[in-house]
Amino acid sequence: MIIKILGEGCSKCDEQLKNVKIAIEELGIEADIQKVEDFREIVVYGVMSTPALVVDEVVKSSGRVLSVKEVKKYL
């Protein structure tokens, strides 16, 4: 599983990354977590507001920080 956090280095993006790491640990799954900060790459996903969560190249959420519980639903 490849998980990407899209965002240009904002504090909300860092919080989303933290919640994703916690969710993965609690679920006991393996995943490659990538932080994408390049605006040109973010636009390719059609995301206009960050942070965004992408799981296996599918945008699951954008524009708000998901809780650990919400992240688990998408994994």
Label every model-predicted segment:
Residues G46-V54:
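Structural micro-motif
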Residues M1-N19:
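Local sequence-structure signature of Cys/Sec-based thiol-disulfide redox active-site neighborhoods
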Residues I29-F39:
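Thiol-based oxidoreductase modules, predominantly thioredoxin-like and allied folds used
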Residues L17, G46, L75:
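Short, flexible helix/strand-to-coil boundary loops that buttress conserved ligand/catalytic motifs
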Residues M1-K4, G28-E30, K73:
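Compositionally biased, disordered extreme N-termini, encompassing classical targeting presequences
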Residues V20, I24:
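Conserved hydrophobic residues forming the short capping helix/wall of the S-adenosyl-L-methionine
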Residues V55-L75:
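Non-catalytic, surface beta->alpha helical segment in thiol-disulfide oxidoreductase systems
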